[in-house]
Amino acid sequence: MVYGFGRSDGTAAAAAGGAPERSWAGEEIAARLWRFYNEKTSTRAITRLQFVEHFGYLLFLKLDHERSQRPGRFARKPVVPEGTWPKLTDLSGDALHGRLADLMRDLGDQAPSRPDRRIAGMVFRDAQPWDLSRMAELAKLITEQIDPHQWTLVPQTELGRAFTIMLRDCREDIDRKIDTGQTLTPFPVLSAVVKVLGVRPDDIVIDPACGTGSTLIAAYQAMQSTDPAAIAGADLDAQMCRLATMNILLNTGRPFSDPAPVKLADTLTRKVPVVREDSGALPTVAICNPPFRSDGVVPNATMRDDFLAYGDFPTNFLQHLMVTLKPGARAAVFVPDGVLFGAGAAATVRRALLKNCDVHTLLRLPTGMFHRKGVKSNILFFTKSTPKPDNRSVTRNLWVYDARTGNHRTDTGNPVTEADFDDFVTACLAGGDISERTESDRFRRYPVDDLLAHPNATFDLKANLAADMEDLGSPKEIASEIADLLDTAATHFREVAEALP
């Protein structure tokens, strides 16, 4: 049985001028592909994330072929060798595996002589086909799900939505990538972030730990920009870079010959912000949800002479943006509670942040929002500035919005929605200026002098000071959080032990 798209009675095709692809919805595309995955593949041998990744590879090849076949001046020069897709549909077994391996190696080559392949170079970088024993399933994916349809006719927004939905459905696999600390950021949160940051069409937005690229997509959609250099990201996980590049391509509709929007890089080793190589323009906005912890990668920032102290991943990413952004740039950085009240490096960075930036807003996020992480999260909003000549702090007031107390969420049964942050956005943007903000039960102002008066300049603040036990989460989540804190403590003790003579 072939699982196609569109209505079997032809109604959708007739309504769309004989092309059913024009009426496809993102949810429908994702559902059909997951049905194929569950019924036509070995789900034990192929993870959901591997399935989505290979769907992305094959869709790239098919779209490139279709664009090259357009009539006259509408045709695009193919990035992939001409005739690749038709030949691929006739292969199976060893021949299919070998051809795909050769293609991935060729397209993933970062050859400077082929600037039109910069995006392909990232989509296929270090990519490998499924195991040889899985080629029958891959051949069916090609011949039953991808080849029969004209994917360039699918509305661009729906195609992008389908890929984003499928990535979201891979949350279990992504959360297992504990070696690089990956997680998925709910779109309603990102929607609120870009509104509060006031992202504009002329902005250049970066994410130095971009994961699947969702932050950049949210910014791009809010900007409605036509400039391909408007967004740029980096990640140290090659698989995430491949997925993020494809995710951005499908959500923005950019030509495959454009410069790559994402690069494979360890941002913390670089003393410069993420920029697009084709433009070199410095960013005006940064949005970052960095790894909160990692079991396989130690923060490598010890060679940074522009760092004041060396801490965990979120502390180092916060510091990286503080020192590399140009004056006037705006930022929103996700941080766990420990960065808000921890001593040592975290306290040093907090004091420097208050001194050199206008740290104007802290959003305490609902508990349970990030899948299986067991940590409480926050977002710090700040604007980079130049130091005051009299050594006073640039920050005058820190406004704290408490969206956490009494608001426990999960990413599946009770996910956050945009309505959860409507009041936050309204409170932040009231009057069009920070000076026009007013306090409420959930929104409170803290003068910077009060923050600095504390020995550690703690940001462990609440807008609603009433004790509320409902925001602690379930016993399982509390236990997970304790385990995370113990892991962090063990890491610090190991560092102390190694430093002792």
Predicted regions and their residues:
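Long recognition/docking surfaces used for binding and targeting
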Residues: 66-174
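Active-site-adjacent bridging/hinge elements
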Residues: 25-34, 163-168, 296
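Structural motif
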Residues: 41-53, 133, 151-158, 473
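A conserved structural/catalytic subdomain of Rossmann-like adenosyl-cofactor enzymes
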Residues: 2-22, 269-270, 274-501
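Conserved S-adenosyl-L-methionine
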Residues: 179-285, 293-297, 304, 311, ...
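Short, amphipathic alpha-helical segments that act as regulatory/interfacial helices
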Residues: 37, 55-65, 104, 108, ...
